[in-house]
Amino acid sequence: MLRIAVPNKGMLSEPAWAMLSEAGYTLRSNPRQLVVEDPDNDVELFYLRPLDIAVYVGMGTIDVGITGHDLLLNSGTDAQEEMNLGFGGSTFRFAAPQDSPITTLDDVEGKRVGTSFDKLVHDYLTEHGINATPIHLDGAVESSVQLGVADLIADVVSTGTTLRNAGLRIFGEPILHSEAVLIRSPRLDPQDERLERLERRLHGVLTAKRYVLMDFDIPVEKISAAVQITPGFESPTISPLHDKQWAAVRVMVPKAKVNQLMDQLYEVGARGIIVTAIQATRM
């Protein structure tokens, strides 16, 4: 069986579970379950701490896992990044007290940086020629300055509300942009059939979220103009209608552009334009 690690908690957990469920995998029914066998899909799911997933995958104990791009880099393991999963977006930023003179990266020189990502911070500072001391903390990083443990922090930021509430302000350029990723053990063949099947399913889920089916009727002489507007992935499906002067068109279009495309199609003569959600795909 393909051994898949999924986050057992945190901001990545529920979107990861939902994505796997939409891809047809069986999830745990009891929150106390740590391992779930899914013989129909030839996989085992292991519910692990997000921080540990890259370590297990890098060691080859687990074949593949879902974790954050930032967590993967901070782990320093040999786990290989396979694909972005489209959720869990965040940035990794420096933050200092509101009244602190620390306002640029150069000001970090000689300072103590509270963080849960000490390797990532160390590598970033070294790359930029800054000599500072990362202080490893497992949680509540934003409290480290007030408690006198650090002069500033480096942490994952989604909205910035937590930092502002702690009297901290973001400064400098983002250290890193991150999102959820699928990672693979270096011991697993990248062409392993089970891995390829998993990736096809996850790509299918992403496509179903980002695209919709659009159906419309169009005068035959306007088909070329309509296809220019909605070319689809390979080519639209075009079918003749009872009235030979009209044709029916079915095509996949980006969900974010639906209304603009409907307007453009209407303007070239399309009528009866209908949009339908996609439940699943294989592209």
UniProtKB/Swiss-Prot annotation:
Primary location group: cytoplasm
InterPro entries named among the record's database cross-references: ATP-PRT_HisG_long (IPR020621), ATP_PRibTrfase_cat (IPR013820), ATP_PRibTrfase_CS (IPR018198), ATP_PRibTrfase_HisG (IPR001348), HisG_C (IPR013115), N-reg_PII-like_a/b (IPR011322), N-reg_PII/ATP_PRibTrfase_C (IPR015867)
Entry's Gene Ontology molecular function annotations: ATP binding; ATP phosphoribosyltransferase activity; magnesium ion binding
Documented activity regulation: Feedback inhibited by histidine.
Record field: catalytic activity: 1-(5-phospho-beta-D-ribosyl)-ATP + diphosphate = 5-phospho-alpha-D-ribose 1-diphosphate + ATP
EC primary class: transferase
Cofactor(s) required for function per UniProt: Mg(2+)
Entry GO CC: cytoplasm
EC number: 2.4.2.17
Pathway(s): Amino-acid biosynthesis; L-histidine biosynthesis; L-histidine from 5-phospho-alpha-D-ribose 1-diphosphate: step 1/9
Compartments (UniProt record): Cytoplasm
PROSITE patterns per the UniProt record, alphabetical: ATP_P_PHORIBOSYLTR
Pfam families: HisG, HisG_C
Keywords annotated in UniProt: Amino-acid biosynthesis, ATP-binding, Cytoplasm, Glycosyltransferase, Histidine biosynthesis, Magnesium, Metal-binding, Nucleotide-binding, Transferase
Transferase is among the record's keywords: yes
GO biological process terms, semicolon-separated: L-histidine biosynthetic process
Family (UniProt): Belongs to the ATP phosphoribosyltransferase family. Long subfamily.
Purpose: Catalyzes the condensation of ATP and 5-phosphoribose 1-diphosphate to form N'-(5'-phosphoribosyl)-ATP (PR-ATP). Has a crucial role in the pathway because the rate of histidine biosynthesis seems to be controlled primarily by regulation of HisG enzymatic activity.
NCBIfam families on file: hisG, HisG_C-term
Protein's name according to its UniProt entry: ATP phosphoribosyltransferase
Organism: Bifidobacterium animalis subsp. lactis (strain AD011)
